[in-house]
Regions:
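His/Asp/Glu-enriched, well-ordered alpha-helical/loop segment
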Residues: 234, 299-303, 311-395
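Histidine/acidic residue-rich metal-binding segments in metalloenzymes
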Residues: 181-281, 297, 308-329, 375
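C-terminal cap of metal-dependent C-N hydrolases
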Residues: 22-25, 362-365, 369, 382-424
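Divalent metal-dependent hydrolysis catalytic cores, especially in the metallo-beta-lactamase
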Residues: 96-123, 134-143, 196-210, 238, ...
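Histidine-rich, glycine-flanked metal-binding segment
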Residues: 2-18, 24-67
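Histidine/acidic-residue-rich catalytic or RNA/ligand-binding cores of hydrolases
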Residues: 80-83, 125, 151, 209-210, ...
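Metal-associated gating/positioning segment near the N- to mid-region
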Residues: 63-129, 147-154, 223, 254-255
Length: 424
């Protein structure tokens, strides 16, 4: 394909580009259509019609064209990952693994990610500058945790005041620890100073407890969470929260957050509350499904599999409850370490749970809306940024194609051809 077209990758062309011969699945939920797509100055000029005489042609015969995929729950800094969350490698190795992770992510068709904890602003800036290929990154910077909460990932015997030493300025920013509204307000402001585009708080324990926490724990008070919401609103952005149990979720909704991460224990009553307050949900099924199959990947005993299996089943039920209640349900992978190259599995899990079209909508239009970029991303429509992915094969008919990254034959990012020729 690359040899046939002669189109180089990596640069935005001044000449208009006409995508010819593909089947367009535009992300709106409408039926697929055989239509050309005209790209001009990094945006979609129109869908359909005939090719302008002066436009360069990119042959997309046999490809299913979808909007650039969005993963709304990633940890790009967790590319080198050890179950103990201690790094025994150099900063150079950490950076190299993160850069490879970014390249693999965009090559898999994810043109945008929302990093929900782990990277400092530097990584997003490097990609934005064009020095390195990778997805567009919206980052929260360091997550906000109470002392002893999920964001304090050092050993239990490690003094709290040493936790900041785990960060790598400009590259890795794990978390800031706060106790009380005033300290949290200061740390949220510090996160914004360091380039955060939104705020993430940890308000319940995790399924895989890093220290002494449990999924049933609630963390931060409603008053503390409300302070973070106030600071985020002052900057025109929002707060999302890591939350599994219903009590923590209800506290966060009462405080004014806009999004819930994971939400694995959401029941019908809580789902109705989310819908009432227009709070979105970003479920993360893949990480739990993977751990059910291989608990040792997180250093867990085989006996942990039964607990993980219960949470995986509950998470699937939570997605269905939220969808039935009318909640905006996005999509996130939450993958860690080298397994991040398998983030596309999330679409397959969701396709099997709901439908391929709904999985695609969650990974495009709905995610774009959740992360605040709905005016520019998420659909193949006139005026949107030209983030487009071409699959060799139809993932709506064969959802396994979502997870087969070698079928991603074309990736455009703001009109730049990032990948062309694979899978044909």
């Amino acid at each position: 394909m690359a040899e046939q077209t002669g189109i180089a990758t990596g640069t935005r062309r001044e000449q208009e580009l006409w995508l010819h011969g593909g089947t367009v699945v535009d992300g709106t939920g409408r039926d697929p259509s055989a239509a050309g797509v005209l790209i001009s100055d990094g945006r979609i000029a129109r869908v359909g019609g005939s090719r302008p005489r002066e436009a360069e042609v990119l042959d997309c015969a046999g490809l299913v064209l979808v909007p650039g995929l969005i993963d709304a729950h990633v940890h790009m800094a967790c590319a080198p990952f050890d179950p103990s969350l201690r790094y025994d490698v150099s900063v150079a190795d950490v950076a190299a693994d993160m850069f490879i992770n970014c390249q693999q992510t965009v090559q898999a068709g994810f043109t945008t990610v929302r990093d929900t904890g782990g990277i400092d602003r530097g990584l997003a800036d490097v990609i934005r500058s064009g020095k390195m290929p990778g997805p567009r990154i919206l980052q929260c910077g360091p997550v906000h945790s109470q002392t002893g909460g999920g964001g304090q990932m050092g050993a239990e015997w490690e003094p709290t005041h040493l936790w900041d030493a785990h960060a790598i300025p400009g590259l890795v920013a794990w978390s800031l620890l706060s106790d009380g509204p005033d300290e949290l307000r200061k740390n949220v402001r510090e996160g914004f100073r360091r380039g955060a585009t939104f705020v993430k708080l940890l308000v319940t324990g995790a399924v895989v407890a890093i220290s002494t926490q449990q999924p049933s724990d609630t963390q931060f008070t409603t008053a503390e969470i409300a302070v973070a919401v106030e600071e985020a609103r002052a900057r025109g952005t929002y707060v999302t929260v890591h939350a599994h149990n219903n009590a923590g979720i209800r506290s966060a909704v009462a405080a004014g957050v806009r999004c819930i991460e994971h939400g694995s224990q959401i029941d019908e009553e809580t789902a109705a509350l989310l819908a009432e307050h227009d709070v979105a949900l970003v479920p993360t099924l893949t990480i739990m499904e993977e751990l059910v199959q291989n608990p040792a990947a997180m250093g867990l005993a085989p006996s942990y599999a039964s607990r993980l299996s219960r949470f995986a089943a509950s998470a699937r039920e939570a997605v269905l409850a939220a969808r039935a209640a009318g909640v905006r349900v996005g999509l996130g992978s939450d993958m860690l370490g080298p397994d991040q190259r398998r983030r596309s599995q999330e679409l397959l899990h969701r396709a099997r749970l709901e439908s391929p079209m709904r999985a695609l909508e969650s990974a495009t239009r709905i995610n774009a809306d959740i992360i605040g970029l709905g005016d520019d991303l998420g659909t193949i429509e006139a005026g949107k940024l030209a983030d487009i992915v071409g699959f060799a094969g139809d993932p709506l008919s064969v959802p396994e194609h979502f997870a087969e990254t070698d079928r991603v034959a074309l990736v455009l990012q703001e009109g730049r051809v990032v990948k062309v020729g694979a899978g044909r």
